[in-house]
Swiss-Prot record:
It is found in: Nucleus. The lineage of its organism: Eukaryota, Viridiplantae, Streptophyta, Embryophyta, Tracheophyta. SUPFAM superfamilies: Homeodomain-like. Residues 40-64, 92-115 bind DNA. The gene is MYB3. SMART domains: SANT. This is Transcription factor MYB3. One of its GO terms (cellular component) is nucleus.
Amino acid sequence: MVKRSQRVGKKAVEVNRGTWTAEEDEKLMNYVSAHGDKKWRMLPAKAGLKRCGKSCRLRWLNYLRPGIKRGNISEDEEDLIIRLHNLLGNRWSIIAGRIPGRTDNEIKNHWNTHLSKRSLTIDDLNNKQNPGLDNRDMLSPTKITQRSTPTHTNKNTNDELIDSWTDLPAPDFDLEQFLSLLPMSDLCPGSNGNDLELNDFGIPINDINQDSFRSDDYNVNYQEFLDSQVWSRAFEFDDIDQFLDCQAYGSLCSPIAGQ
């Protein structure tokens, strides 16, 4: 420990310089707790310390004062220091006032030792906290539009008729009513490839009398069609008696309905 003489009034007093001891820290804390942190110039002599007033003040503010944090500065505190330094510059006392538990001397030393070597800006800190907003991860406006715009399939009238009529069970299928809803061009000979055909609805063409479709009346021999549907569905029944019972009532029964 280096000793140095200092004149206090008319007397020369030896002053210790260097590392503080635990005994000196205890004396300083006891005196400040009892008398407050005022009049630092007269404090060393009253507290029994061979230190100058400035050394006592810095020791108290930077190390012994209640509420001082110990340990390394966290990453969040570093980010806050960088943001405040970009706004305030080297005004360490003001910066320390906005970071609880850290002193201006500690923040200044940490900045000069570690943070000043980094070329981080506020934009870099924002990208660091929100990696999803990085330009490399952002979608282009075209991709966003493609994802947000639903794909709609335009169906013509014929497709809608297929969807609504082919799902009906056989007893509810009214062929005459269905054919009356179709455009006339769909039943006329020489129709183009985009028009409907009867086999699109599960109706076998070979089972229907084609002579029944004429351009003058468009009548359909649907009784023959229903008879053919009845015998073709006979194989769906596990019990032939069940099938014959359905025929006795003159209706098309499904295996599920008969059970």
